[in-house]
C-alpha cells in the first residue's frame, strides 16, 4: 500500500430479521445471500490523489476494530487493578472484547453467560485456552455481573441484558449497542465515553429509515409489509451513543 494519507469507507449489506424465542427474548439476525453468509467491505482511497488503493473483506477487520475500541476504553477508564471480567454474550464480538481486556489489564478470571448453555461452555473452553486464564461459564446474567471489575455486553439482544442496580462502584462497563443497556444505568456512571457519531446522512421515507435495528448508523429499507416487522426506532437514553459505549 502506498504512503498515506488515506480515507476508508465501510459498506455492509444485510438482510435483517428479528426472531423471538419461546421465553420472549427478541434478537436481531443478519445475513447476506443466505443465512450463515456475510458481506462487509472496506474500500481504501488515497486522499492525496483520490485513487482507490484496496478493497478488503472486513469479516475479521471489523471485529478487530470494535475490539480495539473496547480495549482503549478499558486501558484509560478501567481500574489499574482490574482482574475480573463478566461477559454477557458468547459470539464473535464477546471474544473480541475479552482479548483486548487481557492485553491492557492483568485479567485472571472471566465469567461468561449466554442463554445458550452449549455456547457459553464452548466459549469458556476456547477462551481459557487462548488467553491462559480461568473462564467460568455461569447460569445467569446476574452471576456473570456480580463482583467483576469489568462488565462487557456483546449480544444481539433488542432489550437490556442486565439491570442497572447490578452495576457496582468502580465497575468499568463496555456495551456493544445501546439496546443492551438499561436507561437507568446512566445515573450510576461517573463518566460516559462513546465513539464518534458520524454517519451517512440520507433522506428518510416510510420505506427507508435509520436507527431501527441494533446499529444506529444503518439504514433499513423494504416494502410496506416488510417495514411493519421492523423494530421501533432506537431508544434515546440520556447518554445516547454509537457502539461500543464505555463507562
Label the predicted regions.
Residues 186-247:
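Adenosine-phosphate binding glycine-rich loop
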Residues 77-84, 106, 168-169:
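Short helix-loop-beta connector
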Residues 89-91:
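Glycine-rich Rossmann-fold phosphate-binding loop(s) that bind the pyrophosphate
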Residues 133-148, 164:
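Short acidic low-complexity segments
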Residues 103-131:
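NAD(P)-binding Rossmann-fold cofactor-contacting core
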Residues 146-147, 168-169, 188:
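Alpha-helix C-terminal capping/helix-to-coil transition sites in glycosyltransferase folds
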Residues 150, 157-172:
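Rossmann-fold NAD(P) dinucleotide-binding segment
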Residues 1-63, 71, 81, 230:
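N-terminal ligand-binding/catalytic initiation module
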Amino acid at each position: 500500500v502506498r504512503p498515506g494519507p488515506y480515507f476508508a469507507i465501510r459498506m455492509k449489506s444485510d438482510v435483517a430479521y428479528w426472531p423471538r424465542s419461546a421465553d420472549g427474548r427478541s434478537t436481531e439476525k443478519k445475513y447476506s445471500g443466505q443465512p450463515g453468509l456475510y458481506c462487509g467491505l472496506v474500500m481504501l482511497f488515497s486522499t492525496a490523489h483520490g485513487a482507490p488503493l484496496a478493497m478488503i473483506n472486513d469479516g475479521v477487520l471489523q471485529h478487530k476494530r470494535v475490539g480495539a475500541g473496547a480495549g482503549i476504553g478499558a486501558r484509560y477508564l478501567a481500574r489499574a487493578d482490574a482482574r475480573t471480567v463478566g461477559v454477557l454474550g458468547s459470539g464473535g464480538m464477546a471474544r473480541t472484547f475479552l482479548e483486548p481486556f487481557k492485553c491492557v489489564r492483568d485479567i485472571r478470571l472471566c465469567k461468561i453467560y449466554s442463554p445458550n448453555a452449549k455456547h457459553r461452555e464452548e466459549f469458556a473452553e476456547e477462551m481459557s485456552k487462548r488467553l491462559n486464564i480461568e473462564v467460568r461459564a455461569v447460569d445467569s446474567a446476574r452471576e456473570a455481573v456480580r463482583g467483576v471489575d469489568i462488565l462487557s455486553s456483546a449480544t444481539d439482544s433488542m432489550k437490556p441484558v442486565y439491570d442497572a442496580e447490578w452495576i457496582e462502584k468502580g465497575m468499568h462497563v463496555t456495551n456493544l449497542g445501546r439496546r443492551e443497556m438499561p436507561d437507568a444505568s446512566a445515573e450510576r456512571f461517573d463518566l460516559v465515553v462513546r465513539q464518534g457519531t458520524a454517519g451517512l446522512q440520507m433522506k428518510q421515507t416510510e420505506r427507508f429509515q435509520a436507527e431501527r435495528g441494533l446499529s444506529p448508523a444503518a439504514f433499513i429499507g423494504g416494502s410496506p409489509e416488510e417495514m411493519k416487522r421492523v423494530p421501533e426506532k432506537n431508544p434515546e437514553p440520556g447518554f445516547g451513543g454509537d457502539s461500543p459505549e464505555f463507562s
